[in-house]
Amino acid sequence: MNQRLSPIKVEVKTEYIEAQSTPDEEKYLFSYTITIINLGDQDVTLKSRYWCITDANGQQSEVEGAGVVGETPTIKPNTAYQYTSGTVLETPFGVMEGNYTMIKSNGEEFKAPISAFSLAVPGLLH
């Protein structure tokens, strides 16, 4: 697998979903909206995802699977694909990071890294 710079840029926005969270039961729901931008010169298809989710207690969970939100999108050069998903933590703070396995139109497979981002109840961190 080629480990050169990825032609993919990943942007993340997160939101705490207070209405569906129950802190007394250690259930904190977060949504995250991901924008995947193809900066390369070929179509790329997202084949699978890998996430490592760590809560404030250091508990880690790994999530792997085909595509995202039931899709394996093909992203044309200089365009973007966006989706929203969510996760539940047992603590009011956590971190997610991972990668997407992508395939270029020429058949070359590569990993597009997703840098670590925070999930936090507003006002918790100063």
From Swiss-Prot:
Pfam families: DUF525. GO terms for biological process: error-free translesion synthesis. Residues 2-126 form the ApaG domain. InterPro entries: ApaG_domain (IPR007474), ApaG_sf (IPR036767), Uncharacterised_ApaG (IPR023065). PANTHER family: F-BOX ONLY PROTEIN 3 (PTHR14289), POLYMERASE DELTA-INTERACTING PROTEIN 2 (PTHR14289:SF16). HAMAP family: ApaG (MF_00791). This is Protein ApaG. It comes from Shewanella piezotolerans (strain WP3 / JCM 13877). The gene is apaG.
